[in-house]
Amino acid sequence: MTLTASSSSRAVTNSPVVVALDYHNRDAAMAFIDKIDPRDCRLKVGKEMFTLFGPQFVRELQQRGFDIFLDLKFHDIPNTAAHAVAAAADLGVWMVNVHASGGARMMAAAREALVPFGKDAPLLIAVTVLTSMEASDLADLGVTLSPADYAERLAALTQKCGLDGVVCSAQEAVRFKQVFGQEFKLVTPGIRPQGSDAGDQRRIMTPEQALSAGVDYMVIGRPVTQSVDPAQTLKAINASLQRSA
């Protein structure tokens, strides 16, 4: 285990907002990042950007003060998933995720891989049902449960394996907080401020509604990244959340 030089320089934010960086152009991504403040949000780096630009891109974001959610959704045999999660922790990310459908042994191995990192370990979150999926999509896979019921089953398995929480839809958050408790973190994509286009997300909610539902961290993409004034958009979202708290 190595310590990242950037870990001590990152700003602390109390905002639940995580901005999804969905860029295929590095310069465009950095131009956006230069406009926002790490005190107003965290950043999510997904498969496309990580594949294009690698760990060094994450380090650059950390050096600018941002906490990083490394959204790679590891899903592999237990040993491979565990090594991947440990590599993410070594990079100094704030949060990393795996697919709950990888099963109990995989999730337990991932959790154990973070033990040596102690308090510096990232939050380990499991993906339940992707927010783009509907009942018909699950039926195609032979799953007869509704998206909500299947997500709850996977969330229960995630908690049993000792992970920190799950990625879920905002509609599932109320039920999940009741069933799994306040300490079980809920991370929700598909959050759109009032008036935003739904895009490719099927199960969406506004930031205020998500907060009220019990969401701990809300992932917001294009409404911020495509804003004419992203810094002001973030401040407006955070202000609305403070009023709703």
UniProtKB/Swiss-Prot annotation:
InterPro entries: Aldolase_TIM, OMPdecase, OMPdecase_AS, OMPdecase_bac, OMPdeCOase_dom, RibuloseP-bd_barrel. GO terms for cellular component: cytosol. Keywords: Decarboxylase, Lyase, Pyrimidine biosynthesis. It catalyses: orotidine 5'-phosphate + H(+) = UMP + CO2. GO terms for biological process: 'de novo' pyrimidine nucleobase biosynthetic process; 'de novo' UMP biosynthetic process. GO terms for molecular function: orotidine-5'-phosphate decarboxylase activity. Pathway: Pyrimidine metabolism; UMP biosynthesis via de novo pathway; UMP from orotate: step 2/2. Gene3D superfamilies: Aldolase class I. Its EC number is 4.1.1.23. The active site is at 73 (proton donor). It comes from the Bacteria. Substrate binds at residues 22, 44, 71-80, 131, 192, 201, 221-222. The keyword Lyase applies. Belongs to the OMP decarboxylase family. Type 1 subfamily. Catalyzes the decarboxylation of orotidine 5'-monophosphate (OMP) to uridine 5'-monophosphate (UMP). Homodimer. This is Orotidine 5'-phosphate decarboxylase. It comes from Escherichia coli O127:H6 (strain E2348/69 / EPEC).
